[in-house]
UniProtKB/Swiss-Prot annotation:
One BP term from GO: rRNA processing
Signal peptide: none
Disulfide bonds: none
Protein name: Ribosome maturation factor RimM
Lineage: Bacteria, Pseudomonadati, Pseudomonadota, Gammaproteobacteria, Pseudomonadales
């Protein structure tokens, strides 16, 4: 494990260390990938928390249904592992697999202006939630938005009509009163 002074500009958060596992320095990880095991395909991670950035190498990992238990190179002690709790796990954007024309990574949707069929600006996509049935867009008001309401919109084909990443716009079929 090594610290690095490099700024992590083009990194994507793909998981988070939330606890320790056992006494041999393993850590528990919540993976943001789908399926969660995809995180284990990236061997070199950048860990980030409150301005501190560390480079680590994944040695091994396994799934425990809801999360992962991983072993990092040079981390052999429970107390040392505990210090990594709360760190985000990041990888370079360039390592993400290419998607088809109608697929998007969550990070690409965050910040898009959300406009309904009546040309009303609801706000901007702040983040997404995974609910099981379908993902949910959390849209927060911004300058020029219709009102000051936060909206939760289903990320489904019925609701999301079009996405234009270059224009920074997502068009939705959603009534302003919902």
């Amino acid at each position: 494990m090594s610290a690095t002074p490099e700024k992590a500009d083009d990194l994507i958060v793909v998981g988070k260390i939330f606890s320790v596992h056992g006494v041999r320095g393993e850590v528990k990880v919540f993976s943001f990938t789908d399926p969660i095991e995809n995180l284990l395909g990236y061997r070199n991670w950048t860990l980030r928390r409150e301005g501190v950035v560390k480079q680590v190498e994944l040695v091994s990992g396994r799934s425990t249904q809801k999360d992962l238990v991983v072993k990092l190179k040079g981390l052999d002690d429970r107390d040392e592992a505990r210090l990594l709790s709360g760190y985000e796990i990041c990888i370079p954007r360039s390592l993400l697999p290419d998607l088809t024309a109608d697929e998007y990574y969550w990070y690409q949707l965050e910040g898009l202006s959300v406009i309904n069929q009546d040309e009303q600006l609801f706000g901007k996509v702040d983040h997404l939630l995974e609910t099981g049935a379908n993902d949910v867009l959390v849209v927060k008001p911004c300058v020029g938005s219709l009102d000051d309401r936060e909206r939760l919109l289903p990320y489904t084909e019925q609701c999301v009509l079009a996405i234009d990443l270059e224009a920074g716009v997502m068009r939705v079929e959603w009534d302003a009163d919902f």
